[in-house]
Design a protein with these regions (language model features):
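Single conserved hydrophobic/aromatic residue that forms the stacking wall/gate
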Residues: 1-6, 10
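Short glycine/serine- and small hydrophobic-enriched flexible loop segments
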Residues: 18-23, 125, 129
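Conserved PLP-dependent catalytic core of the aminotransferase class-I/II
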Residues: 21-56, 84
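Conserved PLP-binding catalytic core of the aspartate aminotransferase-like
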Residues: 54-85
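Short amphipathic alpha-helices in soluble, non-transmembrane regions
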Residues: 79-87, 120-125
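Conserved PLP cofactor-binding pocket of PLP-dependent enzymes
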Residues: 89-105
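PLP-dependent enzyme catalytic core of the Aspartate aminotransferase-like
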Residues: 102-132
Length: 132
């Protein structure tokens, strides 16, 4: 027998899953969703390259979910400061402490679209320019 609270949690989870499936179908299914995620990732990598920021993983091995980048080659760079700058402007990135290298990560899935990749790039450009 489930408790009332556990039952409510279960119902919310089922409803959330049903909504996620509905949104996936509305977007055109898995193929269309993957296309958007892949496009987000392509744009992100291109925009970061313009800033001189290189991906940690070679493109042949890179998936469209999250991308790890090396820190910019700027002696004034501070990840915590950049993180806060980006967060204050409505976006989030992640520390890249899954490697021994100095890296950070950016996700490209979920409610994220190509225009978000361009906006994030613009925010990062402004931040890095302020450090010159």
């Amino acid at each position: 027998v489930r408790s009332s609270a556990a039952s409510d949690v279960y119902k919310r989870q089922v409803l959330a899953f049903a909504q996620a499936i509905k949104e996936l179908k509305a977007e055109g299914g898995i193929v269309a969703r993957n296309k958007r995620y892949s496009e987000n990732n392509r744009i992100l990598i291109e925009e970061m390259a313009k800033l001189g920021i290189k991906p940690y993983i070679e493109s042949t091995h890179q998936g469209p979910i999250i991308t790890t980048f090396y820190y910019p080659e700027n002696s004034n760079f501070d990840f915590a400061e950049m993180y806060q700058y980006i967060k204050d402007r409505g976006y989030a990135i992640y520390p890249g402490k899954v490697t021994d290298a100095q890296t950070f990560r950016i996700g490209t899935i979920g409610e994220i679209y190509p225009e978000d990749m361009y906006k994030l790039s613009s925010i990062m450009t402004d931040f890095l320019n302020s450090k010159k």
